[in-house]
Each structure stands twice: as C-alpha cells, then as structure tokens.
Regions:
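Active-site core of metal-dependent hydrolases
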Residues: 2-111, 128, 134-135, 167-169, ...
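Short glycine-/small-residue-rich flexible loop motifs, especially phosphate/cofactor-binding loops
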Residues: 27, 47, 69, 117-118, ...
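His/Asp/Glu-enriched, well-ordered alpha-helical/loop segment
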Residues: 32-36, 97-100, 109-192
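Small/polar (Gly/Ser/Thr/Ala-rich) solvent-exposed segments
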Residues: 195
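Short, small/polar residue-rich loop motifs at catalytic or cofactor-binding pockets
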Residues: 199-201
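Short aromatic-centered micro-motifs
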Residues: 206
Length: 217
C-alpha cells in the first residue's frame, strides 16, 4: 500500500503510507526471492515513491502526473489502471453500503482518472490489464471498453490483457499469445473485438489447457 485507498472511509489516497525506506526494503526482499511487486498507489506522492523503490507495477495510478509518467516510462514500470472499477463504484456504491465519505472521495478522484491515463499513453508507459471491484465478473469484461474509451485502441486493450499481462508477470514463455508450445488458454467471442471491443463482454466459450470448459449456453 503505497498510498491510502479511495473506497474506504478512513484512509487518504493522497497520503503516502509506507516510507521510502520501507518500500525499497520490501521490493529488495521480494525481488531477491524472485517475486514481483505491485503497489497500490493512487496519489502522486505515493506513486513516485513506489516507482523510486523499484516496484514492477503501479496499480490504479489515478493521480499520475507528467513527472511520474515520465519516470515510469524511463524505468519500465508497468501501469495497471483499473479504470472501470471507479466508474462502477460511483454508480453502485451507495446501494452496496459504501460510506458517503468514500463516495465523496470517489467522485473527486474519478475526475483525475482520464487525464492520468492519457498521460500514461502519451509517454508510452507499459500498460497491463487488471480490475479491482466487488463485482469481479462484470469488471473483467467491461474493463476492455473502459480502456478504449480512455484512449487505447481495441488491439492495445487486448494486448494489455494478454501478452502484456504475461510479460509483466514474466509468464510470457507460456502465456499471452497463441503459438506452439504455450498453454492453450483462451476465450472466444461472437465477432471481431477489433471492430467492437464490447464483444469481450459476451464470451462464447472458454478453453483451458486445450479443453473447452465453458461452452455457449
């Protein structure tokens, strides 16, 4: 937790929670053990601290400014923007029991989300796909549309969820593309997602290790 969160009633997303030294030590120890480090980071100060500490990816990055976007691009730090979760929470949060104070924070920070994401695209920050929501099934499919609305092409959004996610996790030897020798894990949709990315919300079937596990019903 490089910063506080948004959809909780207590913490402040603008405040750096761990010190620079604590983050650097956590990253050092994790990397020594061969693990990746992802930092929850909303506010600008915490984002920059996490980048300096050497994390592999920034989760959310909602207040990414020009300087931090440049830092990420220069250091090869990934961004997992989770665009849809904030948009969804603002629509459903109160009905799910979110505190009014949390909703107020969400309304404030969602205004930062679009400009921050466009800065990441401007500086060619590496972007991988991810979600962060109570309604995980919906978020997984609708994040594609949010990425495209945010400025990505449909192809870039698909790559974020496939080869780029695999590269971030150093799993691209086995995952991320369809080619001989890799795991046969993929989904099928009714039409070409390059023409309409929202078809990713309508999966026809899922294949896992070469076996169809979710046929069209």
């Amino acid at each position: 937790m490089a910063t506080g969160g948004v959809m909780d009633p207590i913490s402040d997303y603008r405040v750096q929670e761990l010190s620079d030294a604590q983050m650097a030590r956590a990253v050092e120890d994790a990397h020594r053990a061969g693990h990746k480090v992802m930092a929850h980071a909303e506010g600008t100060v915490g984002i920059k601290a996490a980048i300096r500490a050497g994390v592999d990816s920034i989760e959310h990055g909602t207040m990414l400014d020009e300087e931090s976007a440049k830092m990420m691009a220069e250091r090869g730090t990934w961004l997992v923007p989770t665009l849809y979760c904030f948009q969804h929470d603002l629509k459903t949060g109160l009905s799910k029991g979110r505190e009014p104070s949390s909703m107020a924070k969400g309304i404030a920070i969602v205004k930062e989300q679009g400009p921050a994401f466009r800065r990441a695209l401007k500086y060619h920050v590496k972007i991988a796909y991810g979600v962060d929501d109570d309604d995980i099934d919906e978020s997984v499919s609708k994040e594609f549309g949010a990425l495209v609305q945010g400025g990505m092409t449909p192809l870039e959004a698909l790559q974020a969820a496939t080869i780029h996610g695999a590269e971030l996790l150093s799993l691209d030897k086995d995952l991320g593309t369809i080619e001989p020798g890799k795991f046969a894990d993929f989904v099928a949709v009714p039409t070409n997602p390059l023409d309409d990315i929202t078809v990713m919300e309508h999966v026809a079937w899922v294949m896992k290790s070469g076996v169809v596990v979710k046929p069209l019903s």
